[in-house]
UniProtKB/Swiss-Prot annotation:
GO molecular function: DNA binding; DNA-binding transcription factor activity
PROSITE patterns from the UniProt entry: HTH_MARR_1, HTH_MARR_2
Protein name, as recorded: HTH-type transcriptional regulator Hpr
Species in which this protein is naturally found: Geobacillus sp. (strain WCH70)
Annotated DNA-binding residue span(s): 63-86
Length: 201
């Protein structure tokens, strides 16, 4: 039987886990309030917005994938997805080679709502953003929270972090800032950028 040597004290372990727990609770309280305010005009709750977000980046995800990457129970993912389907924001389907799983995809209306949400984002109304602003002014960039990401990777696995990173990479590539708003880059400007990149290399 494999034994691992305990090279930490119980007090140290308790202090660390409670520090993380209480800081996370305080942070979540603020995040939840701002998130709800942001999506309120679109008549969405946090789970519904998260489902739309994941569906956008997956381009077709199973309910179990939605549950996994949305950190919610499968029944929660299914029930909220159903509500979004009733509103015409999602469509449900089965794959020919996978009849067991239910897959969801954003409808045109669903993508439209998500893009309008992106456009309506106002950083001045976000407490976490404003709380991190002094650090950006001091160091020239926002905190990368690498230690937190490492902890999350160790809890939820590599797949979770790959999807997490893919979503933010998509935003970097698919969206541009226009008149102080985030808007989806149109196909023509994407082609033009690719041409310029290939010419310069």
């Amino acid at each position: 039987m494999k034994t691992t040597e305990q090279n930490y004290s119980i007090k140290e372990a308790m202090l660390f886990s409670q520090r993380i727990a209480q800081l996370s609770k305080a942070l979540w309280k603020s995040i939840e309030k701002d998130w709800q305010q942001w999506i309120k005009p679109f008549d969405l709750n946090i789970n519904e917005h998260h489902i739309l977000w994941i569906a956008y980046h997956f381009k077709g995800a199973s309910i179990s994938e939605i549950a996994k990457f949305g950190v919610m129970h499968v029944s929660t993912a299914f029930n909220f997805s159903k509500k979004l389907e009733e509103r015409g924001l999602l469509s449900f389907s089965k794959k020919q080679d996978d009849k067991r799983n239910t897959y969801i995809e954003l409808t045109e209306k669903g993508e439209e709502v998500l893009l309008k949400l992106m456009e309506s984002y106002d950083p001045t109304q976000n407490a976490v953003f404003n709380g991190a602003l002094p650090l950006r002014e001091l160091y020239g960039k926002f905190p990368e929270i690498l230690e937190m990401m490492c902890i999350i990777r160790n809890i939820y696995g590599d797949d979770f972090m790959e999807i997490f990173e893919r979503a933010f990479e998509n935003i970097k590539n698919d969206f541009v800032e226009q008149d102080g708003k985030l808007v989806k880059r149109n196909a023509k400007s994407q082609e033009k950028e690719k041409e310029l990149t290939s010419q310069s290399s």
